[in-house]
Amino acid sequence: MTRKLVLLRHGQSQWNLDNRFTGWVDVELTDQGRQEAVAAGKLMKDEGLQFDVAHTSVLKRAIHTLQGALKELDQDWLPVSKSWRLNERHYGGLQGLDKAETAAKHGEEQVKIWRRSYDIPPPAMDVDDPGHPCHDRRYATLDRNALPGTESLATTLVRVLPYWHDAIAPQLKAGQTVLVTAHGNSLRALYKYLNDVSNEQILELNIPTGIPLLFELDDNLQVRSFRYLGDPEAAKRAAEAVANQGKAK
């Protein structure tokens, strides 16, 4: 039996548009981002996908993308689970900074390492910083020591995998079709795990906003195939645009 899993990065956010490091900052979708959510829903509808359950983060750009896509799918009624473990990677002291200005200051190669390397985190956010997640009531029930002040992709994967094993994988093994709407780096972490991508290869992976990525898995959740829905060239161009965000102007 083929299991189906769709990974969907949220639509364009205001800070995507502004080219700023976002991380755990809870920013809104742009008008384009809301349109991308609807377009993603249409692509999934055209594919004939009928989901049994959906998962998302506790950040509204992902939540609102999921809501827009499900409305277009006429599957608003689906049970939705929200977890901080699907949040974007925490960008530490870079959060809120302009990516191009940061590249001009520190060099494009350093910014690429911070953005796309596997195990090198950006400079940490101090725990006394008002933006640290320990001061956000949505994380009030969590162990303060579990809340990051910065993350690499490696530590993001460590955060995401328990949710995969405890929540998503059992549903897939039960034959359910699952939609996960999350963020560039939490989805890169899942992609790396599912496709057994090397630490070096993951550096070059960029996930575009608002384009569903369909995985077909076997009974053991090994990947049989994966592809972006819609025009492959459009997905390629969108991924290249993500890669260019970390370059100096």
From Swiss-Prot:
Leading EC class: isomerase
Q: What is its EC number?
A: 5.4.2.11
Kindly indicate whether the keyword Isomerase belongs to this entry.
yes
One MF term in the entry's GO annotations: phosphoglycerate mutase activity
Q: Which UniProt keywords apply?
A: Gluconeogenesis, Glycolysis, Isomerase
- Report the domain of life of the source organism: Bacteria
The metabolic or biological pathway listed in the UniProt record of this protein is: Carbohydrate degradation; glycolysis; pyruvate from D-glyceraldehyde 3-phosphate: step 3/5
Q: Which InterPro entries match?
A: His_Pase_superF_clade-1, His_PPase_superfam, PG/BPGM_mutase_AS, Phosphogly_mut1
Q: Which GO terms describe its biological process?
A: gluconeogenesis; glycolytic process
Its catalytic activity? (2R)-2-phosphoglycerate = (2R)-3-phosphoglycerate
Positions binding substrate in this chain are 9-16, 22-23, 61, 88-91, 99, 115-116, 184-185
Against SUPFAM superfamilies, the record matches this protein to: Phosphoglycerate mutase-like
Q: Which Pfam families match?
A: His_Phos_1 (PF00300)
Q: How does it assemble?
A: Homodimer.
Q: Which PANTHER family match?
A: PHOSPHOGLYCERATE MUTASE
Q: Which family does it belong to?
A: Belongs to the phosphoglycerate mutase family. BPG-dependent PGAM subfamily.
Q: What is this protein called?
A: 2,3-bisphosphoglycerate-dependent phosphoglycerate mutase
Q: What is the lineage of its organism?
A: Bacteria, Pseudomonadati, Pseudomonadota, Gammaproteobacteria, Lysobacterales
